Amino acid sequence: MVVTQALVQAGADTVVIDREHGAIGRENLHAMIASTAGTNCRPVVRVGKRDEAMVKLALDMGAAGIVFPQVNTAQEASDCVAMTRYSPRGRRGFGPFIGILDGVCPFKSIYRSSVARSSATS
């Protein structure tokens, strides 16, 4: 967490939080992502495996992106993308948490417009 804060203060525009090779638990992940709130630094989480619950957790905490390990086929890549997108183009669920609210956003209208855009492009 201290390293993340130092990177934010140094002006980093992105920080990669490595849960595949790093011993980072849920609480520390949340603290690391939260330390970027209100800054121009975007937290990207490298998940330990292609696990939908792990991906949703990171995104709900406010991760700006996900890096998936060991993606070797087009089908695996498609499955990874589906984990990050809301229905109807994906499997991500909606919950009004900090990552979705992003502090002050009107989450219902953002969600509805996201679904409308997804539906229009399907």
Outline where the language-model segments fall:
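Hydrophobic faces of well-ordered beta-strands that scaffold small-molecule active sites
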Residues: 15-17, 43-47, 66-68, 120-122
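Short, ordered loop/turn segments at secondary-structure junctions
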Residues: 19-22, 48-49, 71-73
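Conserved anion-binding
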Residues: 53, 65-122
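Glycine-enriched alpha-helix->loop->beta-strand junction motifs that scaffold or abut catalytic
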Residues: 10-14, 60-65, 85-86
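Alpha-helix-loop-beta-strand connector modules within alpha/beta enzyme cores
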Residues: 24-60, 82-89, 113-116
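Glycine-rich, proline-tolerant flexible connector loops at the mouths of alpha/beta enzymes
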Residues: 3-4, 8-31
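Short beta-strand/turn micro-motifs at beta-sheet edges
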Residues: 2-4, 108-109
